Amino acid sequence: VEWFQKAADQEYPRAMMLLGECYENGYGIDRDAAKAVALYTKAHEAGHPPATCSLGLCYEVGTGVEVDKTKAVQLYRQAAEEEDARAQCNLGFCYYRGIGVEADDKQAAEWFQKAADQNYRRAIYLLGECYEYGYGLEKDVKRAIELYTKAHEAGYPPAACSLGLCYEIGTGVEIDKVKAVELYRQA
Protein backbone atom coordinates (compact mmCIF):
# COMPACT_ATOMS: atom_id res chain seq x y z
CA VAL A 1 0.00 0.00 0.00
CA GLU A 2 2.83 2.39 0.90
CA TRP A 3 4.45 2.08 -2.52
CA PHE A 4 1.13 2.46 -4.34
CA GLN A 5 0.54 5.63 -2.29
CA LYS A 6 3.98 7.02 -3.20
CA ALA A 7 3.39 6.34 -6.90
CA ALA A 8 -0.18 7.69 -6.74
CA ASP A 9 1.15 10.87 -5.12
CA GLN A 10 3.25 11.27 -8.26
CA GLU A 11 0.08 11.07 -10.40
CA TYR A 12 0.83 7.58 -11.77
CA PRO A 13 -2.63 6.38 -12.99
CA ARG A 14 -2.03 2.64 -12.58
CA ALA A 15 -0.88 3.18 -8.99
CA MET A 16 -3.98 5.28 -8.30
CA MET A 17 -6.15 2.46 -9.58
CA LEU A 18 -4.28 -0.20 -7.59
CA LEU A 19 -4.42 1.91 -4.44
CA GLY A 20 -8.15 2.31 -5.11
CA GLU A 21 -8.47 -1.48 -5.23
CA CYS A 22 -6.69 -1.68 -1.87
CA TYR A 23 -9.19 0.77 -0.36
CA GLU A 24 -12.18 -0.88 -2.02
CA ASN A 25 -11.28 -4.39 -0.87
CA GLY A 26 -9.38 -3.75 2.34
CA TYR A 27 -6.06 -5.07 1.04
CA GLY A 28 -3.47 -3.98 3.59
CA ILE A 29 -5.58 -1.03 4.72
CA ASP A 30 -9.04 -0.37 6.14
CA ARG A 31 -11.81 -0.40 3.55
CA ASP A 32 -12.86 3.04 2.38
CA ALA A 33 -15.18 3.01 -0.63
CA ALA A 34 -15.19 6.82 -0.95
CA LYS A 35 -11.38 6.90 -1.21
CA ALA A 36 -11.50 4.06 -3.73
CA VAL A 37 -13.94 5.99 -5.91
CA ALA A 38 -11.85 9.16 -5.62
CA LEU A 39 -8.74 7.27 -6.75
CA TYR A 40 -10.56 5.50 -9.59
CA THR A 41 -11.97 8.85 -10.71
CA LYS A 42 -8.54 10.47 -10.70
CA ALA A 43 -7.01 7.59 -12.68
CA HIS A 44 -10.00 7.63 -15.07
CA GLU A 45 -9.52 11.36 -15.65
CA ALA A 46 -5.85 10.63 -16.40
CA GLY A 47 -7.00 8.27 -19.17
CA HIS A 48 -6.44 4.85 -17.56
CA PRO A 49 -9.09 2.47 -19.04
CA PRO A 50 -8.87 -0.20 -16.29
CA ALA A 51 -9.69 2.50 -13.71
CA THR A 52 -12.57 3.67 -15.89
CA CYS A 53 -13.92 0.12 -15.78
CA SER A 54 -13.46 -0.08 -11.99
CA LEU A 55 -15.30 3.22 -11.61
CA GLY A 56 -18.08 1.84 -13.80
CA LEU A 57 -18.42 -1.16 -11.51
CA CYS A 58 -18.69 1.17 -8.50
CA TYR A 59 -21.61 2.92 -10.21
CA GLU A 60 -23.20 -0.37 -11.24
CA VAL A 61 -23.28 -1.82 -7.72
CA GLY A 62 -23.18 1.31 -5.56
CA THR A 63 -19.70 1.04 -4.05
CA GLY A 64 -18.94 4.47 -2.59
CA VAL A 65 -21.47 6.18 -4.87
CA GLU A 66 -25.20 6.08 -5.57
CA VAL A 67 -26.13 3.29 -7.97
CA ASP A 68 -26.31 4.72 -11.50
CA LYS A 69 -26.45 1.92 -14.03
CA THR A 70 -26.62 4.32 -16.99
CA LYS A 71 -23.39 5.97 -15.87
CA ALA A 72 -21.86 2.52 -15.35
CA VAL A 73 -22.65 1.62 -18.95
CA GLN A 74 -21.16 4.92 -20.18
CA LEU A 75 -17.95 4.24 -18.27
CA TYR A 76 -17.77 0.62 -19.43
CA ARG A 77 -18.28 1.75 -23.03
CA GLN A 78 -15.53 4.35 -22.75
CA ALA A 79 -13.05 1.79 -21.41
CA ALA A 80 -14.27 -0.93 -23.81
CA GLU A 81 -13.63 1.32 -26.78
CA GLU A 82 -10.06 1.67 -25.46
CA GLU A 83 -9.78 -2.14 -25.72
CA ASP A 84 -10.09 -2.90 -21.98
CA ALA A 85 -11.17 -6.56 -21.96
CA ARG A 86 -12.84 -6.44 -18.53
CA ALA A 87 -14.88 -3.40 -19.61
CA GLN A 88 -15.82 -5.11 -22.87
CA CYS A 89 -17.07 -8.11 -20.91
CA ASN A 90 -18.93 -5.94 -18.38
CA LEU A 91 -20.54 -3.92 -21.16
CA GLY A 92 -21.53 -7.15 -22.89
CA PHE A 93 -23.07 -8.37 -19.64
CA CYS A 94 -25.06 -5.14 -19.32
CA TYR A 95 -26.51 -5.79 -22.78
CA TYR A 96 -27.00 -9.49 -21.92
CA ARG A 97 -29.10 -8.71 -18.83
CA GLY A 98 -30.46 -5.26 -19.68
CA ILE A 99 -28.48 -3.46 -16.96
CA GLY A 100 -28.54 0.28 -17.64
CA VAL A 101 -29.42 -0.35 -21.29
CA GLU A 102 -32.10 -2.20 -23.18
CA ALA A 103 -31.23 -5.90 -23.39
CA ASP A 104 -29.64 -6.72 -26.76
CA ASP A 105 -28.20 -10.21 -27.19
CA LYS A 106 -26.47 -9.30 -30.45
CA GLN A 107 -24.58 -6.43 -28.79
CA ALA A 108 -23.79 -8.68 -25.83
CA ALA A 109 -22.28 -11.35 -28.07
CA GLU A 110 -20.24 -8.76 -29.99
CA TRP A 111 -18.71 -7.32 -26.80
CA PHE A 112 -18.10 -10.80 -25.37
CA GLN A 113 -16.29 -11.71 -28.60
CA LYS A 114 -14.03 -8.64 -28.35
CA ALA A 115 -13.07 -9.53 -24.78
CA ALA A 116 -12.72 -13.23 -25.60
CA ASP A 117 -10.33 -12.29 -28.40
CA GLN A 118 -8.12 -10.94 -25.60
CA ASN A 119 -8.48 -14.23 -23.69
CA TYR A 120 -10.65 -12.74 -20.96
CA ARG A 121 -11.94 -15.90 -19.23
CA ARG A 122 -15.37 -14.68 -18.18
CA ALA A 123 -16.08 -13.41 -21.69
CA ILE A 124 -15.01 -16.72 -23.23
CA TYR A 125 -17.48 -18.46 -20.94
CA LEU A 126 -20.32 -16.00 -21.61
CA LEU A 127 -19.70 -16.21 -25.36
CA GLY A 128 -20.07 -19.96 -24.93
CA GLU A 129 -23.49 -19.39 -23.36
CA CYS A 130 -24.45 -17.22 -26.33
CA TYR A 131 -23.50 -20.04 -28.70
CA GLU A 132 -25.15 -22.75 -26.62
CA TYR A 133 -28.51 -20.98 -26.47
CA GLY A 134 -28.38 -18.89 -29.65
CA TYR A 135 -28.32 -15.55 -27.83
CA GLY A 136 -27.38 -12.87 -30.33
CA LEU A 137 -25.88 -15.26 -32.84
CA GLU A 138 -26.60 -18.56 -34.50
CA LYS A 139 -26.83 -21.48 -32.08
CA ASP A 140 -23.71 -23.66 -32.28
CA VAL A 141 -23.42 -26.15 -29.43
CA LYS A 142 -20.06 -27.50 -30.64
CA ARG A 143 -18.60 -23.99 -30.51
CA ALA A 144 -20.11 -23.53 -27.03
CA ILE A 145 -18.32 -26.70 -25.86
CA GLU A 146 -15.03 -25.40 -27.30
CA LEU A 147 -15.44 -22.09 -25.48
CA TYR A 148 -16.49 -23.69 -22.19
CA THR A 149 -13.45 -25.97 -22.44
CA LYS A 150 -11.14 -23.04 -23.15
CA ALA A 151 -12.55 -21.03 -20.22
CA HIS A 152 -12.37 -24.07 -17.93
CA GLU A 153 -8.76 -24.77 -18.93
CA ALA A 154 -7.99 -21.11 -18.18
CA GLY A 155 -9.32 -21.65 -14.65
CA TYR A 156 -12.84 -20.18 -14.80
CA PRO A 157 -15.02 -22.33 -12.44
CA PRO A 158 -18.47 -21.54 -13.94
CA ALA A 159 -17.23 -22.98 -17.24
CA ALA A 160 -16.50 -26.31 -15.53
CA CYS A 161 -20.07 -26.32 -14.24
CA SER A 162 -21.59 -25.62 -17.67
CA LEU A 163 -19.30 -28.17 -19.29
CA GLY A 164 -20.28 -30.68 -16.61
CA LEU A 165 -23.94 -30.16 -17.41
CA CYS A 166 -23.24 -30.71 -21.12
CA TYR A 167 -21.61 -34.05 -20.29
CA GLU A 168 -24.36 -34.97 -17.83
CA ILE A 169 -27.22 -34.53 -20.29
CA GLY A 170 -25.39 -34.95 -23.60
CA THR A 171 -25.52 -31.42 -24.95
CA GLY A 172 -23.07 -31.38 -27.88
CA VAL A 173 -21.12 -34.34 -26.47
CA GLU A 174 -21.75 -37.97 -25.60
CA ILE A 175 -23.21 -38.44 -22.14
CA ASP A 176 -20.39 -39.13 -19.68
CA LYS A 177 -21.61 -38.99 -16.07
CA VAL A 178 -18.14 -39.67 -14.65
CA LYS A 179 -16.67 -36.72 -16.55
CA ALA A 180 -19.66 -34.59 -15.52
CA VAL A 181 -19.07 -35.33 -11.83
CA GLU A 182 -15.35 -34.62 -12.23
CA LEU A 183 -16.13 -31.23 -13.79
CA TYR A 184 -18.69 -30.39 -11.11
CA ARG A 185 -16.09 -31.13 -8.45
CA GLN A 186 -13.61 -28.84 -10.21
CA ALA A 187 -16.20 -26.08 -10.31
Q: Where do the model's predicted regions map?
A:
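Hydrophobic face of amphipathic alpha-helices that form TPR/SEL1-like repeat modules
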Residues: 18-25, 54-61, 75, 90-97, ...
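Low-complexity/repetitive intrinsically disordered segments
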Residues: 1-10, 15, 38, 42-45, ...
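Short helix-capping/linker turns of helical repeat alpha-solenoids
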Residues: 10-13, 25-27, 32, 45-49, ...
